[in-house]
């Protein structure tokens, strides 16, 4: 039976509704209820068509593992439950397979999880793209750029512990295979005012706290910092520590990330020095001092902080102190210098700190771009990831919130335009009628802000540039004049009477009705922040710094390049950047992730319906669903649709043989689905009402239960039949085995009985024979015993007789001896003095030996073992003693000679001795090698850079490194090769490139052959059948033949414990591939020179002519 494969879908095991397009009925209450139901079951992702809604869970979920990455890899968008990985995979495959540039737009409030979403997108793309050393390096650099940018650009706010205080857009560049080549990062409007002041409950940028918490004591001392946060005025103390955040560990992560991205050590140190200088700038305090002319000026209270800053940045202390006290204004040909009061001095200090940090951040982004940018010039595919600050509504909203919310308005505008455009294009592409739906277009709000003549930004620039007194109040007055009638602008001075008594709208504020809601803006600081003014004196002081990084951050401080033109305002710069970003996004295929914050407490498991409702409204999610459902709520390609519902029709089940569209048409006709409820596109089926889809799902579920019942019935029948047949076969087998067992048992009984009977008979016969043999043995033993006793008696009698006769003879001899002694003593008593001669002889002999030894002491030869001199003996009788003394002295001086050698010298002499035993009187070349030291390493491989690759490839100790001539097996010509001998291998390498050509294990070397003549040719024979012997034996020529053969012999003996066979003959055989070739040495002609020549005569002979 064919196996049925049922593919999964987001419709399977669905909690709530996975795609809001299928929600029925569709209203705000059901929308929020569906999100809450999925949120409570840890389903934080929901679709609106191809748009992903992400609800921040404020905790880690086990849905981002490598296994999950593999689950969503190369899968259909609707095949699995909603996930950010599905959108990432869809965008990546569209880029790789369809050659469409992609952009992923991540929007939402601050704290909704946009930064984490962007990191998840990048990590997924990095996981699914290609592998390889270069590709992995690019992926690692792209991923590690995030920790660096987060440390310098993110901070804790009241709504988010890791809030992005800058906008980031990264273009990731891919090659035609989909492998990453590099990337380019663009940053937008760093909130640099945070450097000098933070709202209550918020922190400065992460890097300040990470540096003080994670830097070593040595580094802090070098940067002139202390670990105590309270020492620095620029750091807020009420939120210095964040629960669950380890600043020290994060600092180590940032340092490691900077190293991976490509920052050099001195660059990282320079960055930290600038950060330390910014921190210490906040500790500079001023005091007022009156001058003679009545003007107030400021003086620095404690110059110690100023001194340390100047030491860090290598700035002249006098120059920096003057820059804090005076301001120089330059006209065309005129300079005016004025003193700064205390308030102006503090303004100058804070402006310097903000500009220094802001420019450092821009330098960091450019430095990262240099490292991660694509190195090739080929055409690239691009995937853009936009992680930009979310819509912000605080108690006090200033210029930064105004700019941030303007950017979000533009993103909402492009979302509306591209969503409608994509929907309309799909209907046109599929030839489906398009039904228009009304929606709120926020273009009117964008125009209120960015209009070149009457826009708020244009009027702010105009106010900043006009002469005269310019304040935030004059700017507000101008807004009231121009924008008073605008329906989305509110102010106490506007012409609408209902705002005149609105106590929620202060006189110094204005309110804009954004797409996300109304936001009240304090005009205080708008003009200053837009001007972004830094006194020229401070710029010039920074340019004079000996610190190369700080000097590069202030090019306008160069006196040789004075530019009197006013720099562009912050608002105009940001407006131009946003316009460029919008144009960039419109050229790419958009993918949307809409992030939603479930509560303001940053806590898990809390779902604030009113807060979520507000976000749903201003994000326009309901309108997005209605746009998707304006024509048809559900659409699917024909193939997966037929695959999913084919069991509902007999004609399409189990296999449809024909086009998928025809199968779907047959299926829908069979199910009698009304024509007005569906339409057939070119490649997709479109279903108008979600109820129709759910009816299909119910029918499919019921049909699957019926199929399951059918499969169970067939399976149970098959199982019973199989069991019956098995029992039947088992009965036959059991009966056969039982009969066999019974016959075997009966045979064993008969056999056992026969053996018992046989054993009893054999035993009876054996016992009978044994009794007869024992009787015969006893008779023989009795006769032997009687004879023995008789012979013994006779022997004892004879022995007694012989002993008595011997005693008598001995007594006679003793008596005779005594008698002779007495007789002799009586006869020679008169000659007693004759004994003195013996004594004189012995004395004389002793004196001669003594004199001999004393003379030998003074005549001893030198201690050289090769000195053959030895004094002559004076007397013949001392000959043996003389030779023995010579032998003993020679052994003694040899021992003394050996004792003075080092281990290295002993090894050299052992090798020389080995060479002598192997080649003396056998090889004519040997005598010339005696005086030559064995060097081994004739090539300095370790020192020669040309052989670095060869050196890295050899991990063992090199015993011989020499250039030899390898004889070509085919024609006898020679080729230079590097001959290398290690502890375990013999290697041949190319002399020019150092590439290893051959590697032979010493265990495969069986013999070395050479001639007896004065030449350097030798053959290395290899074990037959070994891998190294595939081309045959080697034939070499070398000027150091004796040394190479000796070391090869000793090394082989040390490693294999077997002596290497050394054959010395003027004719020997070698194996060249499949042929055995005779190498014959002949006497050469002197006319051909003194160098031996080699020539291949035929397939069986190779001649070597030795002159």
Curated annotation (Swiss-Prot):
Cellular compartments per GO CC: brush border; cell periphery; cytoplasm; filopodium; myosin complex; plasma membrane
Residue stretches making up the TH1 domain: 923-1107
GO molecular function: actin binding; ATP binding; calmodulin binding; microfilament motor activity; phosphatidylinositol-3,4,5-trisphosphate binding; phosphatidylinositol-4,5-bisphosphate binding
Binding site for ATP: 108-115
Keyword ATP-binding: yes
Location in chain, cross-link Glycyl lysine isopeptide (Lys-Gly) (interchain with G-Cter in SUMO1): 287
Domain Myosin motor: 15-701
Region Actin-binding, annotated ranges: 592-599
UniProt record, GO biological process: actin filament bundle assembly; actin filament-based movement; transferrin transport
Boundaries of every IQ domain copy: 704-727, 728-749, 750-778, 780-807, 808-837
Covalent cross-link Glycyl lysine isopeptide (Lys-Gly) (interchain with G-Cter in SUMO2), where: 287
SUPFAM superfamilies the UniProt entry points to: P-loop containing nucleoside triphosphate hydrolases
Keywords assigned: Actin-binding, ATP-binding, Calmodulin-binding, Isopeptide bond, Motor protein, Myosin, Nucleotide-binding, Phosphoprotein, Repeat, Ubl conjugation
PANTHER family in UniProt: MYOSIN, UNCONVENTIONAL MYOSIN-IB
Role this protein plays: Motor protein that may participate in process critical to neuronal development and function such as cell migration, neurite outgrowth and vesicular transport.
Family the UniProt entry places it in: Belongs to the TRAFAC class myosin-kinesin ATPase superfamily. Myosin family.
Protein name, as recorded: Unconventional myosin-Ib
Organism for this UniProt entry: Mus musculus (Mouse)
